[in-house]
């Protein structure tokens, strides 16, 4: 499926938005990168490099930059929405309802619900989610990577696939929108926990145990929400968890490490989705009687109610059980 070199709006000029705009050009298309701040957009257009969020990656000539949202989406079939989750509601409210929406943030709506549900509640009929083990620093440089676009609208998923697939980026489609979206949400919390382990210098055994039990916790939650179990072990589940929990590029892992050292978890103004997600998921689990022990521990530590040591002890002190026990 080809777009014939058409223009693709990329709404959000952070690191991931910038990397996706560059990826669009590698697939043979033009991209319009929208930045909310006019001064920032002007600087990007002039310098051709996002020194604030993705230094070292130059914007190709096929990427235009604007702060005019109407201009950015004019004539487009769909747009990649790449702002942090807290900014998604306001951005969606300003977009035409016949536009296809591809959500690229790995977070939850303000009420703790799914961003795809929020988009549909606002009147968007064509909605998809893009997720996978994709660090902007590597995708922007053209290092090999793979990702998943999921939607109930398979035609839209196919168009997004054609927009991004290239010799350096494998793009798979999926009909499991719930699993792909929520896998990207929950892995951020598990990555925060692995950062706590790193910051406390608890060793490789502890990290391996945390990641493995975290995957189990992810699986229970995703399946309870209607996801396919196979998705848990795909790129948007296990793949994204491995990348986020182990990489030096991971904001969430770095935030957990910073908390363990007694430092502020958000550095350089970059959004750490897992900090907010942990509290929302913990509140949901408590209200619905679900056992998400790692999420609970991270939420308590992130809120300052528990120290990192107390959080780890809460996990190590749980009752004895079978490994496969729910």
From Swiss-Prot:
Keywords: Cytoplasm, Lipid biosynthesis, Lipid metabolism, NAD, NADP, Nucleotide-binding, Oxidoreductase, Phospholipid biosynthesis, Phospholipid metabolism. GO terms for cellular component: cytosol. The active site is at residue 187. Pfam families: NAD_Gly3P_dh_C (PF07479), NAD_Gly3P_dh_N (PF01210). NADPH binds at residues 16, 36-37, 106, 136, 251, 271, 273. InterPro entries: 6-PGluconate_DH-like_C_sf, 6PGD_dom2, G3P_DH_NAD-dep, G3P_DH_NAD-dep_C, G3P_DH_NAD-dep_N, NAD(P)-bd_dom_sf. Its EC number is 1.1.1.94. Its main location: cytoplasm. One of its GO terms (molecular function) is glycerol-3-phosphate dehydrogenase [NAD(P)+] activity. Catalyzes the reduction of the glycolytic intermediate dihydroxyacetone phosphate (DHAP) to sn-glycerol 3-phosphate (G3P), the key precursor for phospholipid synthesis. This is Glycerol-3-phosphate dehydrogenase [NAD(P)+]. It comes from Deinococcus geothermalis (strain DSM 11300 / CIP 105573 / AG-3a). The lineage of its organism: Bacteria, Thermotogati, Deinococcota, Deinococci, Deinococcales. The gene is gpsA.
